Amino acid sequence: MEVVPAEVNSLLPDDIMDTAITLVDEDSIEAVIVSSPIPMETELEEIVNINSTGDSTATPISTEPITVYSNHTNQVAVNTTVSKADSNTTVKPAFPSGLQKLGAQTPVTISANQIILNKVSQTSDLKLGNQTLKPDGQKLILTTLGKSGSPIVLALPHSQLPQAQKVTAQAQPGDAKLPPQQIKVVTIGGRPEVKPVIGVSALTPGSQLINTTTQPSVLQTQQLKTVQIAKKPRTPTSGPVITKLIFAKPINSKAVTGQTTQASPPVVTGRVLSQSTPGTPSKTITISESGVIGSTLNSTTQTPNKIAISPLKSPNKTVKSAVQTITVGGMSTSQFKTIIPLATAPNVQQIQVPGSKFHYVRLVTATTASSSAQPVSQSPSVNTQPLQQAKPVVVNTTPVRMSVPFVQAQAVKQVVPKPINSTSQIVTTSQPQQRLIMPATPLPQIQPNLTNLPPGTVLAPAPGTGNVGYAVLPAQYVTQLQQSSYVSIASNSNFTGTSGIQTQARLPFNGIIPSESTSRPRKPCNCTKSLCLKLYCDCFANGEFCNNCNCTNCYNNLEHENERQKAIKACLDRNPEAFKPKIGKGKEGESDRRHSKGCNCKRSGCLKNYCECYEAKIMCSSICKCIGCKNFEESPERKTLMHLADAAEVRVQQQTAAKTKLSSQISDLLTRPTPALNSAGGKLPFTFVTKEVAEATCNCLLAQAEQADKKGKSKAAAERMILEEFGRCLMSVINSAGKAKSDPCAMHC
């Protein structure tokens, strides 16, 4: 037997001294025998109260063993004392842990006062009535079931609970404001015929036991063998509240929302949405049906500058200023703006009437021009017709509506709108003829033809534009197209806005036609770490995209155009002539090509592809800074290497042509139908080998194999017989073909 430590005895009441811990087996526990019936609810005499401030009343006590065991691996037996005072005696032990009140315990008389307690898992909760008993820690509250007794609080350490063989009784000073102590809920029972106890004490955050006096304990049995506190499933006191929101589709709602991007169907052109007297602001209400839940309906109040005016003859004053812009493309902010042409062929004029605070916009439509429009960013198409009277028409773009009048005009004056960004490019002319304003869509730009440009010229757009772009062209191209920042307008009537870019014919330079120079395949690059965005990448330096190269992690393609443009700009900032061809014409009057800056070879003798002159198959000139150069006309090494290089190139071309011809012939044989007749009109021999002939031949071969097996021939003899039979079959096929060739009529009969 193991003795309880001294700190345990010091925390227990003074009248309890004989306490020990004994490890017993579960098989040694005897059944609990109830000697007397349990009294009913009406037979309860009193409620035992425990007051923390009162003193304990000493009564004659006797020591009785109480066996406590757990469902876990270890079993603990505690010998404690049970007072045998009368039922009227009030026991008030002083507990510093803040226990103020103990619930009414049901008096149960058990022989030998043996009580079996089962420990509940930490995840279980016990709820009775409105009280919820939640285990928060490892503290055990044990009470005897006599008519009067002293409860014992056993606090088990967290780290030693599964392996503990000692019970430490701990009593801590209580404080009402401290967080709730960790209490371990225990159950009494574990035997068959379990009867639950209805009235159970609950713990408050102040570590107090409050009696559930509203519903006293009631036992519905006459005989009790084991008492167990029923384990209830955990019921949270406060759960999530589910709110169901039903959104109904608005039908006739006219709610006004200030800052909401509306999505409405296109408004029919020419529809009068407001009727008001002049001088008062008109209010246009557009009701749109949307399938998206939560969409709102906007009511747009038009400002007085959208009042329709009467037809004007000719404006008194034309102000050259920026045209009113509206947002497009579904943008909720107004930072992206562009000019929206309302029709294909109007001229926009902003009119300022002297002495008037209103701003008017007049659109003059041509009589013979078509009225199809192409707004920017996939706006709804608007078809406009010249109107005799000025009527407000709402042109529906996605976020903004603008009402403008259409009037007939007799005189036309030049108006040049200020472009907002690089995509809005509109220029008008001063000729009093039909005007055609190009829509601000990314159409192919009409670019002029520029001649007499050196090959490899780097082109930049006109200064003043926001976006700076570079067009790097290979050295073999002669035509250099300059990007213009405007769109020219044709004065004739048969002008089409979809004309392509015009290019000039390629001219021979340095005695070599571009088609001849491009016939030579470009050497693939082998870049690994430069992303093909450095000048030592031949593809990047020549202004070409990588194609069929051996590079890794390549950015020199259309998928990484932004990074490529940044690298080009960085190279041009360091050297404006970085992308110009290094092999160009010599001085005037010279037809030979020469290096523009010269090579700087030191150890290769200018006879390897490291030398740019040798790679271009030109000789080094006086401007080269090479050392030990052998790349001159009289050099035998150069002649030998050049001949070898030419021979190797010719051999590669021949091999490529042979492979191409062979593959084409094979594909031709596979796709070409098999001719059944020869040139003389006879049937070819292989056409006699049909499916039936093949099956008959196989049967003959199998028959020879079976015959050789029956005769007990050796393997070699059997193979000889099969081959001889196969030869006879082939000879019969050939003889049949010969007979058919000699007698053509037999083939047709």
UniProtKB/Swiss-Prot annotation:
Binding site for Zn(2+) 6: C606, C620, C626, C629
The keyword Transcription belongs to this UniProt entry's keyword annotation: yes
Transmembrane feature ranges: none
Region (DNA-binding) residue spans: 523-536, 599-612
Any Gene Ontology biological process: nucleosome organization
SS bond partners: none
Residues modified to Phosphoserine: S264, S282, S310, S314, S635
Site keyed Critical for interaction with target DNA: positions: Y536, Y610
Residues involved in Zn(2+) 3 binding: C532, C546, C551, C554
Region (Linker): 583-596
CRC domain: residues covered: 521-634
Cell location: Nucleus
Coiled coil: none
InterPro entries named in the record: CRC, Lin-54_fam, Tesmin/TSO1-like_CXC
Positions of the record's site feature: Interaction with DNA: R574
Keywords, in A-Z order: Acetylation, Activator, Cell cycle, DNA-binding, Isopeptide bond, Metal-binding, Nucleus, Phosphoprotein, Repressor, Transcription, Transcription regulation, Ubl conjugation, Zinc
Stored PROSITE patterns: CRC
Quaternary state and interactors: Component of the DREAM complex (also named LINC complex) at least composed of E2F4, E2F5, LIN9, LIN37, LIN52, LIN54, MYBL1, MYBL2, RBL1, RBL2, RBBP4, RBL2, TFDP1 and TFDP2. The complex exists in quiescent cells where it represses cell cycle-dependent genes. It dissociates in S phase when LIN9, LIN37, LIN52 and LIN54 form a subcomplex that binds to MYBL2.
Protein known as: Protein lin-54 homolog
Upper classification of the organism: Eukaryota, Metazoa, Chordata, Craniata, Vertebrata
